[in-house]
Amino acid sequence: MLKFTRALLSLIFIFPFALAFANPDFSVIKAQAKLSDDTYLAAESMAEHLQEQGQTLVHQATFVNSQVSYLLSEKDGVQTIAIRGTANLENVMLNLNVSLLPDTKLDIMLHQGFAYAAKAVYKDVKPYLVAGKPIQTTGHSLGGAIAVIVAMYLKMDDYPLTNVVTFGQPKVTNVSGAERFAGLPLTRIVTLQDIVPLVPPLSPLQIQELDIYWHLGEEVILMGNNKFSITSGIKSMLRATKFTSAIPSEQNLTAHKMTTYLGLVNALTKKSTEVPYKMQISLFGFSLE
């Protein structure tokens, strides 16, 4: 117990609770949500839908072996890489239970499946990127995880990465990996009942070695009723301790859908109120709020 306590205190020291966040721009988030949703379209209708949003389709590709698909579009000189996720929550849950392996390029530990897919996307998209033009990445579900790793590669290669927005994104790295890429301009959009960003849950055995899956970036929780909360670091991680069931409910399935995210974000573009996220978790007799 003492070792666990020391480890948790170390995490609190590395990733403090109180950080200053700028108010999220939900019009920007909505634009990224639309692009993430566009990745689920059939290839033949994608260009037309993008044009309706003022976007020009530059390139689209699907990798048959992995079923990973992405699009590269451009609007007002900004390039966006949007990566498709999956609508099958059971497949997501199965893919999350994979060991972390070292990535020699980034010098961090990564989820091996996400890293493999991200390398394929990055290799394929590089010839289509215009040097000097701003780049942003986005994606839903597993696509969000791949979008984060692609953003890491872009940052390492000194591309002008300006924004990363993901929806229902699972964790991709561990504590040291999150610390190394703490400067990544990442905003993670989640819903209250979406369990994908929460798993795998916190394990006392893993936390003793500080080798647990860990999120990076700012977390914006869509609460419904035009309300949202913002968390990060240890507070974001502790949300996972409230998840105890590995069997997704119908409510969880709905909460993970891209259509759910689009509806909640669209409402927040019209009216938004930030509220504190109440974890209802105590540590050493103190409430962590």
Name each region found by the language model.
Residues 8-18:
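Bacterial N-terminal signal peptides
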Residues 1-9:
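Bacterial N-terminal signal peptides that target proteins for export
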Residues 21-138, 142-289:
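Non-catalytic, mobile gating and regulatory segments of ester bond hydrolases
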